[in-house]
């Protein structure tokens, strides 16, 4: 039997009481319950200046890349902002590339304060495909998140 797949959940929200982080914690706990080791890549803990191609190794870029490369599968989580995914996640993905995502299985999770976050998921799917990742056909979406979570 093959060893369990290591799953990294990348939280694209910087908010302290983030519904995205809560949802990722639940998803990662479910993976752990199935025997998979997990890592939460919480972007609040990384120094990632706005991406500049002249400074690809700025801040904690190397640590972010290593944390994602170490995983067999990646779950990207983002709140919906103006119909798309959050800038911190976009910035983190800009520091990554084929080395981190090519042939990696990627799951998508989006959280919205209002309507269904369809566009967020579609945008993330397009970015992951451009990185040659294997994006799961099923995705997780949580509309009206404040009504779904009570005390975590």
Question: What name fits each language-model region?
Answer:
Residues 2-3, 63, 135-152:
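Glycine-rich phosphate/pyrophosphate-binding loop and the adjoining helix
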Residues 46, 110-115, 144-147:
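Acidic, glycine-rich active-site loops and adjacent beta-strand->loop/helix elements
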Residues 59-134:
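Helix-loop-strand module that forms the ligand-binding subsite of alpha/beta enzymes
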């Amino acid at each position: 039997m093959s060893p369990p797949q290591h799953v990294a959940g990348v939280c694209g929200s910087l908010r302290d009481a983030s519904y995205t982080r809560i949802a990722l914690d639940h998803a990662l706990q479910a993976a752990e319950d199935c025997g998979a080791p997990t890592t939460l890549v919480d972007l609040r803990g990384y120094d990632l200046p706005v991406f500049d191609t002249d400074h690809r190794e700025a801040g904690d870029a190397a640590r972010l890349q290593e944390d994602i490369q170490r995983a067999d599968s990646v779950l990207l989580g983002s709140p919906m902002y103006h119909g798309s995914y959050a800038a911190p996640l976009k910035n983190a993905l800009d520091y990554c590339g084929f080395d981190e995502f090519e042939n990696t299985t990627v799951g998508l999770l989006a959280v919205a304060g209002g309507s269904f976050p369809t566009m967020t998921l579609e945008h993330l799917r397009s970015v992951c495909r451009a990185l040659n990742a294997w994006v799961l056909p099923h995705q997780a979406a949580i509309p009206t998140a404040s009504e779904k979570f009570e005390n975590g």
